[in-house]
Amino acid sequence: MKCDARYAEKYRMRPISDELGMEIDGYLGVIRKVTPELYDVFVLTYIKRWEKQGIWRYLHISRREYFNRLKTVKTSLLLLLSTEGKQYLFIA
């Protein structure tokens, strides 16, 4: 279930610093403990780069549920980054 080469450009990101990468990794660990289903969607989408349809089938969720979970986990991660982890606030 690898990503299609036609869409490889879509997933390109600007490099981030090592410190920010470690911070994101730590917050993803918190998200994993609290809501593993959100963590799974994030990892399969952005780290493993699976196709959306493959993720829906693998996790047995609808298209709508996939996008809801993805939006929620992205918002939670951004909130953790913006508060610098001082407060663990989740949208889940």
UniProtKB/Swiss-Prot annotation:
Domain of life of the organism encoding this protein: Bacteria
UniProt name for this protein: Uncharacterized protein HI_1421
